[in-house]
């Protein structure tokens, strides 16, 4: 019996082995066939450049998203450029961008960061810059459950209500005390937004903090500079070694000193804020803050990772909503007829009552204003570079493993084949028979697509939507003389280079 039992086991093993080998060969054959099909596709068109430096001199405008968009009119929606010794494939249409973000995601899910961003993100310790792995899934789940998801945003509603009431109060005070004098809209809105960011992160606003590592007490404005302004400045700092990786062994001391100083100051301030929060017993702060959530739900994270993840929520809240709201008010002030139409729509919905979040779905024209502003002034004109870790295809072209890929959101939103008069700000393009469609949220690509879609889309929509609505409901906005030409942006971002200066007149209740 033992002999026959052994024979039976051996026979089963042999049969299983043959089955495994058969299917493995089939799988290998299928894989090779697919790879063969990919490799026979044409190569991505190449933008002519110079020896050694490639196309770097052609990017001297320092606004690559605009240069990339102009090139797309010549070379098509997908092309390759040389950044020093590195090749970069640039995508400039919604179709190719969605293909990379959704259809080919499994082949292009890795981030490729500049030397500056590698330091400032603590080597991809942020949700937005981490590779799509277990760490990313954990921290994004925490971000949605603890702060940016639908349920979490309901819990944070009182922060948004206080934000718009404070902004409204300060604007009314300016109109009363300095009638017909331009108001610096950014100074007011930015200050209040930063307060909301701190409350969500630490449970309370912070007017000043003693930073032991720096030996100084910083005011709220100084905290903002360290945590937001300096980081935006550092993110676009250029290290020539990014373009010539084979020379990375050569020191670039001035660059390294600048970035490390910003990074260390940011961590020092974050550590001070975290320690201050941990000392609170709940009497002065809201226990439902993101720091508490991370510390209780993600115990595998290091202290530095927690600091960076909490900081990420601050910069996202304080920056994205500001960019969109400021540009929307600028365009509304520039186009009085659009402003009047929006004001009438809000009046028809609210009557004499204040506009509220619950009414956002009832104002399609306001939603058109919001999405058209996102289209023309996307807060992130360029998506952080991605890396193809295997051969794939995009737009009918072969993309070899090792390719670096840049998605030009600005170019997608200025594509003349997709958008009528893309250079014009025209909210009506988002209206379908006078109705707002929820799918409009993804038409502009401003929040990305697929598994890496921006976690902050809901918060940005709520904050900017209610802010724009209330500001137009309560004030008539006009640009000061010369303000219409103030359209320059800061570095690689869409933020206005100069703060919006407008003349406001309170509307009658």
Swiss-Prot record:
Chief location: plastid
TM region positions: 3-23
Coiled coil: none
Name of this protein: Ent-kaurene oxidase, chloroplastic
One Gene Ontology biological process: gibberellin biosynthetic process
Catalytic activity, as annotated: ent-kaur-16-ene + 3 reduced [NADPH--hemoprotein reductase] + 3 O2 = ent-kaur-16-en-19-oate + 3 oxidized [NADPH--hemoprotein reductase] + 4 H2O + 4 H(+)
UniProt cross-references to Gene3D superfamilies, sorted A to Z: Cytochrome P450 (1.10.630.10)
Alphabetized UniProt keyword annotations: Chloroplast, Heme, Iron, Membrane, Metal-binding, Monooxygenase, NADP, Oxidoreductase, Plastid, Plastid outer membrane, Transmembrane, Transmembrane helix
The species this protein was found in: Arabidopsis thaliana (Mouse-ear cress)
GO CC aspect terms: chloroplast outer membrane; endoplasmic reticulum
SUPFAM superfamilies per UniProt: Cytochrome P450
Enzyme class: oxidoreductase
UniProt record similarity statement: Belongs to the cytochrome P450 family.
Chloroplast intermembrane side: 1-2
Binding site for heme: 454
Function: Catalyzes three successive oxidations of the 4-methyl group of ent-kaurene giving kaurenoic acid, a key step in gibberellins (GAs) biosynthesis. GAs, which are involved many processes, including stem elongation, play a central role in plant development.
Membrane disposition: Single-pass membrane protein
Enzyme Commission numbers on file: 1.14.14.86
Molecular functions (GO terms): ent-kaurene oxidase activity; heme binding; iron ion binding
Subcellular localization: Plastid, Chloroplast outer membrane
């Amino acid at each position: 019996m033992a002999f026959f039992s052994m024979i039976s086991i051996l026979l089963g093993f042999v049969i299983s082995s043959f089955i495994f080998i058969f299917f493995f060969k089939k799988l290998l054959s299928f894989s090779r066939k697919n790879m063969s099909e990919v490799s026979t596709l044409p190569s991505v068109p190449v933008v002519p450049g110079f020896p050694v430096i490639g196309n770097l001199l052609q990017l001297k405008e320092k606004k690559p998203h605009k240069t990339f968009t102009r090139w797309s009119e010549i070379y098509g929606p997908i092309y390759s450029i040389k950044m020093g010794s590195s090749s970069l494939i640039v995508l400039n249409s919604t179709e190719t961008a969605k293909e990379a973000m959704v259809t080919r995601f499994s082949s292009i899910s890795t981030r490729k960061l500049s030397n500056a961003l590698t330091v400032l993100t603590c080597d991809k310790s942020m949700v937005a810059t981490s590779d799509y792995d277990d760490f990313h899934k954990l921290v994004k789940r925490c971000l949605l459950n603890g702060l940016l998801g639908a349920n979490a945003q309901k819990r944070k509603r009182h922060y948004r209500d206080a934000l718009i009431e404070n902004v409204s109060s300060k604007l009314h005070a300016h109109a009363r005390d300095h009638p017909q004098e331009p108001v610096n809209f950014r100074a007011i809105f930015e200050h209040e937004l930063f307060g909301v960011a701190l409350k969500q992160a630490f449970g309370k606003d912070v007017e000043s903090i003693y930073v032991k590592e720096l030996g100084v007490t910083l005011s709220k404005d100084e905290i903002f500079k360290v945590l937001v302004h300096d980081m935006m400045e550092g993110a676009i700092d250029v290290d020539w070694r990014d373009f010539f990786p084979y020379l990375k062994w050569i020191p670039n001391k001035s660059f390294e000193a600048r970035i490390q100083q910003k990074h260390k100051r940011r961590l020092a301030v974050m550590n001070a804020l975290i320690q201050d929060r941990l000392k609170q017993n709940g009497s002065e702060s809201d226990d439902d803050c993101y720091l508490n959530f991370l510390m209780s739900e993600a115990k595998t994270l290091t202290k530095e990772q927690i600091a960076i993840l909490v900081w990420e929520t601050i910069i996202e809240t304080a920056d994205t909503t500001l960019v969109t709201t400021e540009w929307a008010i600028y365009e509304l002030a520039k186009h009085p007829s659009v402003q009047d139409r929006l004001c009438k729509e809000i009046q028809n919905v609210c009557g004499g009552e204040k506009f509220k979040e619950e009414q956002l779905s009832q104002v399609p024209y306001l939603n058109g204003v919001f999405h058209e502003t996102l289209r023309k002034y996307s807060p992130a004109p360029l998506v952080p570079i991605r890396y193809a870790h295997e051969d794939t295809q995009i737009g009918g072209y072969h993309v070899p493993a090792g390719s670096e890929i840049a998605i030009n959101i600005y170019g997608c939103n200025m594509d003349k084949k997709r958008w009528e008069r893309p250079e014009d700000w025209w909210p009506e393009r988002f209206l379908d028979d006078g109705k707002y469609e929820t799918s409009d949220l993804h038409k502009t690509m401003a929040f990305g697509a697929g598994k890496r879609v921006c976690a902050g889309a809901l918060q940005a929509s709520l904050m900017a939507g209610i802010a724009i609505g209330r500001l137009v409901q309560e004030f008539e906005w006009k640009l000061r003389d010369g303000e219409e030409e103030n359209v320059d942006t800061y570095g690689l971002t869409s933020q206005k280079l100069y703060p919006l200066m407008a003349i406001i007149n309170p509307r009658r209740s």
